[in-house]
Amino acid sequence: MARKGILGTKLGMTQVFDENNKVVPVTVVKAGPNVVTRIRTTERDGYSAVQLAYGEISPRKVIKPVAGQFAAAGVNPRRHVAELRLDDEAAVAEYEVGQELTAEIFSDGAYVDVTGTSKGKGFAGTMKRHGFRGQGAAHGAQAVHRRPGSIGGCATPGRVFKGTRMSGRMGNDRVTTQNLKVHKVDAENGVLLIKGAIPGRNGGLVVVRSAIKRGEK
């Protein structure tokens, strides 16, 4: 089955009850409506993909080259544009320019991967950023309690290895959480209730796609 996807907005978390009256924590995602603005084919572009546009924006804020792309597709300008890769040419036939996608492309019980931008934490130490345990609180430890410790040898190798976990900026990265279950699809309001937490802040842009490792239930 071809992977499906849609752009949306993370609204926040809440909790609902399932059929067994157990509390289920869910993230509310405003999914779509998206509009198809371009279709990529292997023959013409070297790969298969569909370009989706989402979100309202004033036409005054759209630069002319981008406005021309929307005009060529025959749709009003949108705030966000993203390409979703398709598995093969057969999946391309399911889309056409100007087509509108809503939350109904998913069903209750489907499994999805959600991609978003994680919350930025600023400059963080190794204990917060990488989970280091720190150093002793007593036995002569002085002003080193949250330090990482050694970052390499002196003469051998005489340098710090690339990729060594150290302090630095944390968060504000593209993160994907896989195999989340769609608890409920509210087609009337264009909302997905996804079990568990997803990356990013409330109001942030997210991409919801069919789970690549599990697929639909």
From Swiss-Prot:
Q: Keywords in UniProt for this one? A: Ribonucleoprotein, Ribosomal protein, RNA-binding, rRNA-binding
**Any Gene Ontology biological process:** translation
Keyword presence, Zinc-finger: no
> Could you name the Gene Ontology cellular component terms for this entry?
cytosolic large ribosomal subunit
MF terms from GO for this chain are: rRNA binding; structural constituent of ribosome
InterPro entries the record matches: Ribosomal_uL3, Ribosomal_uL3_bac/org-type, Ribosomal_uL3_CS, Transl_B-barrel_sf
Function statement: One of the primary rRNA binding proteins, it binds directly near the 3'-end of the 23S rRNA, where it nucleates assembly of the 50S subunit.
Q: How does it assemble?
A: Part of the 50S ribosomal subunit. Forms a cluster with proteins L14 and L19.
Family note: Belongs to the universal ribosomal protein uL3 family.
- List the PANTHER family hit by this protein, alphabetically: 50S RIBOSOMAL PROTEIN L3, LARGE RIBOSOMAL SUBUNIT PROTEIN UL3C
Name by which UniProt lists this protein = Large ribosomal subunit protein uL3
- Lineage of the source organism? Bacteria, Bacillati, Actinomycetota, Actinomycetes, Mycobacteriales
